[in-house]
Structure formats: C-alpha cells, structure tokens
Amino acid sequence: MRILIASHTYIVDLNCEKLRALAKLEPGIEVTVVVPKKWQPGGVQNRIIETEYRDEGAFKIVPISNFSQNHQGLLTFGADLISLFQKFRPQIIHVEQGSRGLAYTQMIILNQLLGLKAKNVFFTWWNLPYELKLPIALLEKYNLNHSHGIISGNQDGADILRQRGYEGEIKVLPQLGVDETLFTPQPQPELAAKLGISQNEFVVGFVGRFVPEKGLLTLLKALVNIKDKSWKLLLLGRGELREEILKIATENNIQEKLIILESVPHDEVASYINLMNTLVLPSETTYKFKTLTAVGWKEQFGHVLIEAMACKVPVIGSDSGEIPHVIGDAGLIFPEGDDQALDNCLSQLIEKPDLADNLGEKGYQKAMEKYTNKAVAQQQYEFYQLIIDN
C-alpha cells in the first residue's frame, strides 16, 4: 500500500514515530510524508523552520514548496507536488489539515486530474459546532463530498461531521501515539530527592500550559480543600497564570507544597511524570475564544494522559471534551470546574493505595493496547484497508 500523508505536524521529527511504525507494519507498505518546506509555528517557537528531505527506505519525508507559512487552513503546495504524485502514485492521500483545508482540496483535484484513483482521507481535531459562510461552506462541502474516509481525533469531532451530513467511514483516533520506550514505569528516587519530595508525600502532577482553560485554578482550590493531607503539587509548564498560582499558594500557606518547573526537555518529561502519584488534567470548556467560523474551546484529546498511563501513573480528568473517552474506566473523572469533586478524587487516591495501583495498571494496559505509536499505526492501517476494500 502506497500512503501519502500531508501535514505541517511532521516538520517535528519526534511527531513522525507513528508513521515510521506504519511503514514497518507489513512488507509492501510505503509511507511518504509531505511537509511544507518552510513553516513558522508562532508562539514560543516563533521562527521559520526549514525542513529537509529524509529517505529511510519505506518511510520518506518530502519537503514541498508552500504558499502559507503559518496558517493551517491556508496551507497549499507548489508545482513540485505534481511530480511527487506522478512518481509515487499513492493509493491513500491523507491530509491532516481539517475539513476546510485548502491543501486537501488541492490534493483531491490533483488526484482526479492525474487519474490516480487514490482514496481521499482527512484528519480533524475540531470538536465544537460551527457555522460556515460562503465561500468556506462550499469548500468544506466539496472536501466532504470527495472524502472516502475521515479520521477524527475525538468523538465530538466525529459527531459534528455526521451532523454536517457526512455519511462515509469515520474513525476516532489520535493524531499521535505515545513512545512506550520513553514513557515507561521507572522510579526516580534521585530526582525526587533533588526536588525535595519525600517518600511519604503524595505527588499531584500537571503538565501543560498555565492558562485558565486548562483548569489549574480548580486544581489549586481542590488542593487547598485538603491542604492538611501530605501532598506536593508538581507543575510542568509555563503561562499567564504563573503569578496567580504563586499568589494563591502563598495566601493559603501551601507555597512549600508547590514545585514549578518551566522548562523541561521532552525526553525528560517521562522522568518527572514517574515522580507523580497521579496526573491531573482538569481542563474546562470555554467560549471566550473566537475564530472565523466558531466560538470556544474544549479539550480535544489530552495527550499527556496517555503518557502518564504508559508510566502506570493513575490519571484524574475533568469531563471536558475527549478526556472521559481517553480515560474510560482507567482513571477518575470529575465535572469540570468542580473543585470539591476533584478533591474527592484526590482523596480517594491518597487514602486508597490499592485503588491507585489498580487504576495505574488499567491505564497502562489501555495505553499499550490502544495508544502506542505502533497501536495507533495499526488502527490507522486497518482503516485504510477498510476504505480501499469499500
């Protein structure tokens, strides 16, 4: 099977491990990844990234000239895409830029013009209802009408596409898996000692941006409710709420229980997760954000959850977006924004070590079965086979 996948996501080599796993599943699978030659992510990485060609046999990364360097929806590719299509002749064309991506439209048209008869697939994370005006409504309608299958990163996204009239195959699957060789259970006594964490302290962990929608203030309130218990809060990340977090901690006399680490390299994150007795993702749905077509945000997946699960760390999550689906029965769920419900979850794990061990083991098994790079690649390959057979 010849598979062509296009996305700016794979500019970062670390994000390519699932696709490398895909290329190794069976003899005869070839994976060519199209990435923009130049891309400017914005945010903390506000610099232009120039990509390079890589040939690893059945897996290749091919930079193609592009016309937008920092907008997913407007990303389109140059004429060198035509020669790649003619040479590779893909059987699957999979574009990870959402339902309204111009690059997807471009590749659908090229597929038709070159007579490739490849199956068209796109990936989306979008999980809130939206309204479209012309000409964007026509663009999405065209893309949906010419899609043989869709992969949605979450169940809400799949439901929305059904509501918008799509009747073809949809698979719910994350864009990226977890590297189980990196995220694996491994005690960290030296790191714990370095951070001043003693053996009898229950470590509550959070990894992510310090922003309101990630629910950090609810987590702090929950911990203030149980401040007499023996715990420490380990926060990995940075963001606008840092000063408010420190202020609340000082006002409630829990500053000695707080550890903030702003800059941790990705290959060291697993070590810090292994310090945790639980990882909490207390995300909260918000309607403060606006785009051209929609208002709001809710958790689209929560990748850090599967990283913690792979380390046998029990997880607690709010019921925002995809979190309950990711966790299932392998962790604890609380209503978003409810600090009392969250402190109840925390208290259960602190007071019931057997429950914590059981949830850690359940989460580990689920991560190994569903969320490793190889497991995600296998599910993606089976979906491709399904739409080719149809």
What are these regions (language model features)?
Residues 35, 137, 144-188, 303:
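Donor nucleotide-sugar binding/catalytic pocket of nucleotide-sugar-dependent glycosyltransferases
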Residues 348, 355-370, 381-382:
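A short, well-ordered alpha-helix in the C-terminal region of glycosyltransferases
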Residues 297, 305, 310, 314-317:
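Short hydrophobic beta-strand element within catalytic cores of glycosyltransferases
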Residues 8-11, 98-102, 110-134, 146-149, ...:
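A short, histidine- and acid-enriched strand-loop-helix "catalytic/donor-clamping" loop
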